[in-house]
Amino acid sequence: MAVNVNTNVSAMTAQRYLTSATNAQQSSMERLSSGYKINSAKDDAAGLQISNRLNVQSRGLGVAVRNANDGISMAQTAEGAMKETTNILQRMRDLSLQSANGSNSKADRVAIQEEITALNDELNRVAETTSFGGNKLLNGTFATKSFQIGADNGEAVMLNIKDMRSDNALMGGKTYQAANGKDKNWGVEAGKTDLTITLKDKREGDVTISINAKEGDDIEELATYINGQTDMIKASVDEEGKLQLFTDNNRIDGAATFGGALAGELGIGAAQDVTVDTLDVTTVGGAQESVAIVDAALKYVDSHRAELGAFQNRFNHAINNLDNINENVNASKSRIKDTDFAKETTALTKAQILSQASSSVLAQAKQAPNSALALLG
């Protein structure tokens, strides 16, 4: 082996391995201290891109869960207020039935009407003041809003909260008053027993109801017979013996038309719009009509409460799914980006040993040219 002074190949080789070991040691220390095996694009360019996309998705899923929880909270707030609306309407119905009883005097009914009016004011106050995050929920201004429950655009769900004010048309219906009252001595005449009611059901379309009363039926029996034949229209009789008919705006679209001999004899009038806001229980007829109006309002409120309950259940399932997706996304990201401490500590130990060995060899290699001095000696 030649003895060289100008070029120390052994030292150069030792220096190269020392540099490599030092770089490996620094890389291992960076991975262990940060907890990530990918700290820059040079570590793994493809892995960095994939892990960043997964991180974006994970953060989006986290926001979606928060959005869904906000949606549940909003629906719970609205539904909770609507529960009180239901309680108010039930009390109104009780009072209407009480007022319809013959044992009450005019003064009694006026007193009952005062409570009806107070309850109506409270129902509207609930509708006007129920809010969530500054958004009024029940006064008709909320309309429809979207809730982003996904990590990407286009993954929104619409929520509609309806108007719960007492003057809302869907909190009532249409009433029809007969012009001709009938006393207890009146009875359905032979050949004049037919009554036809034509209306448009929102679910079934145009419907014609044929009522064939029995000869001799009085006005109360006629009302009972009508109620027994269909649930699309409610019949009652006021204190003057006049037939009253009511259709629910939630089910019937537009006004009903009446035909047949009985329609002409009774003189059934044109439709009048009525809502909870117009309840008047100061008469027997008004009290009877109020029961039908409140029943329609209760159906409307309860139906929307059911919709909000379904919305909450849907969002609960959405949150469960989002949490599951987020868990799997983070597991994938962890496998790509996170440091395997067992593996990396082994690599660090190896790099430290090689670094120390290379340093020792380099020190010895630097002494090799000194042997040339012995030859000159």
From Swiss-Prot:
The keyword Secreted applies. SUPFAM superfamilies: Phase 1 flagellin. It holds the Pfam family Flagellin_IN. Keywords: Bacterial flagellum, Coiled coil, Secreted. V.cholerae is able to differentially regulate the flagellins within the flagellum maybe to produce flagella which are particularly suited for motility within a given environment. PANTHER family: FLAGELLIN. Belongs to the bacterial flagellin family. NCBIfam families: PRK08869.1-1 (NF006466), PRK08869.1-3 (NF006468). This is Flagellin C. It comes from Vibrio cholerae serotype O1 (strain ATCC 39315 / El Tor Inaba N16961). The gene is flaC.
